[in-house]
């Protein structure tokens, strides 16, 4: 079987990229990773306003996205290691009153599964695992465990679960273990202000309240591996979360709890020969800034733009010029957000009194500096980036 693009991995990023390429008339195959998590996860994603605008061009019923709560404000606080008053900072977008939306991952996946089911030229393989690729010739040949093989002009790797395949890439990765577990807690309840997300930084780790429907929200708390919170029962954890967030939220009731190991990974290049990286394998960052999927959507939109533009002037869709331009154009943004969140998590969760005092002064300064806050919001919402495509 021959395709224009073959994906290994069927996560949200892969499905978004596949739909985008299919709508440009390309023939696409998705090989589903057997280790990928079920759609029943309670995880949520913050989608910036720019990402939402892009995604609504890809799906038949964009109203499905618009039903979720619009986030108009993000309030952050930094606890004082000495126990005195917290420092606060508020981010808003005064031009549009919208920073983005928080949407459950399973809803996003369902939207793009539905879109894939409506499109032609899509093949989904569920019972195979690629074990080797040969991308040194004009096309890429992908060899399966079953000894079958398929060919494509471009192989897109969006799964990080196949160590053997990753080793064969001519790409270096930067890795870091946060020694943290993310507690993803689905709750019933509301914040004190409608359309406002909250994040609190303390020595226990960053905790965020992320509302996505009128009376439903997610609490994400990144705690150390050895924290007693990891094994705490629902009732006791509910009491602690309510105490932690009582200045931001009305009483919250826990529905369910999931736990995820947090690790950092950053690819120094986004391609190797005719293999392209998209999604978490390209940059798996701390959830502290809520930018993980937004970075991937920026990657996807630019990659598809380059493929379309180069093809229109006679280049093959696996031309090295496409891959080089894609890598160079996305380098700065991906590096800044990936390593910026790595440093930010270390600084804001520290128990060092001097670092905490300096951080508090920095937050106090930033709260008073509307110009700096405007720059931050402009970058986080991504609207300028998507408008430039």
What positions do the PLM features span?
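Conserved N-terminal helical subregion
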Residues: 1, 57, 68-168, 176-181
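Glycine-rich FAD cofactor-binding loop and adjacent beta-loop-alpha segment at the N-terminus
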Residues: 4-6, 10-72, 106
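Short beta-strand to alpha-helix junction loop
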Residues: 46-49, 93-114, 228-235, 262, ...
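Conserved FAD-binding catalytic core of PHBH/FMO-like flavoproteins
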Residues: 55, 154-250, 254-257
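FAD/FMN-dependent oxidoreductases across multiple families
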Residues: 229-313, 317-321
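C-terminal helical "tail/cap" subdomain of flavin- and related membrane-associated enzymes
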Residues: 305-389
């Amino acid at each position: 079987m021959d395709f224009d693009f073959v994906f290994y991995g069927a996560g949200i990023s892969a499905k978004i990229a596949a739909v985008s390429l299919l709508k440009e008339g390309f023939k696409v195959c998705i090989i589903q990773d057997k280790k990928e998590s079920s759609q029943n996860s309670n995880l949520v994603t913050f989608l910036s306003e720019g990402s939402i605008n892009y995604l609504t061009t890809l799906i038949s019923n964009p109203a499905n996205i618009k039903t979720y709560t619009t986030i108009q404000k993000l309030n952050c606080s930094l606890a004082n290691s000495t126990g005195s008053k917290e420092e606060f900072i508020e981010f808003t977008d005064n031009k549009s009153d919208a920073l983005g939306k928080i949407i459950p991952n399973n809803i996003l996946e369902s939207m793009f599964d539905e879109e894939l089911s409506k499109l032609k030229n899509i093949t989904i393989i569920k019972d195979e695992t690629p074990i080797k690729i040969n991308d040194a010739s004009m096309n890429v040949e992908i060899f399966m465990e079953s000894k079958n093989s398929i060919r494509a002009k471009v192989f897109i790797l969006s799964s990080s679960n196949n160590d053997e395949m990753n080793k064969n890439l001519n790409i270096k990765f930067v890795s870091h273990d946060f020694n943290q577990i993310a507690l993803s807690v689905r709750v019933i309840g509301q914040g004190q202000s409608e359309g406002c997300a909250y994040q609190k930084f303390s020595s226990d780790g960053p905790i965020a309240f992320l509302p996505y429907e009128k009376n439903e929200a997610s609490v994400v708390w990144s705690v150390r591996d050895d924290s007693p919170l990891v094994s705490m029962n629902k009732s006791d954890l509910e009491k602690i979360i309510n105490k932690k967030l009582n200045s931001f939220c009305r009483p919250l009731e826990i529905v369910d709890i999931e736990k995820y190991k947090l690790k950092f990974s950053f690819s120094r290049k986004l391609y190797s020969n005719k293999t392209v990286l998209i999604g978490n394998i390209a940059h798996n960052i701390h959830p502290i800034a809520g930018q993980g999927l937004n970075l991937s959507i920026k990657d996807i939109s630019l990659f598809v733009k380059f493929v379309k533009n180069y093809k229109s002037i006679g280049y093959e869709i696996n031309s090295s010029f496409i891959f080089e331009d894609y890598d160079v154009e996305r380098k700065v943004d991906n590096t800044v957000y990936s390593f910026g969140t790595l440093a930010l998590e270390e600084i804001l969760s520290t128990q060092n009194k001097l670092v905490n005092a300096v951080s508090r002064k920095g937050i106090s300064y930033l709260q008073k500096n509307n110009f700096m806050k405007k720059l931050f919001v402009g970058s986080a919402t991504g609207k300028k980036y998507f408008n430039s495509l």
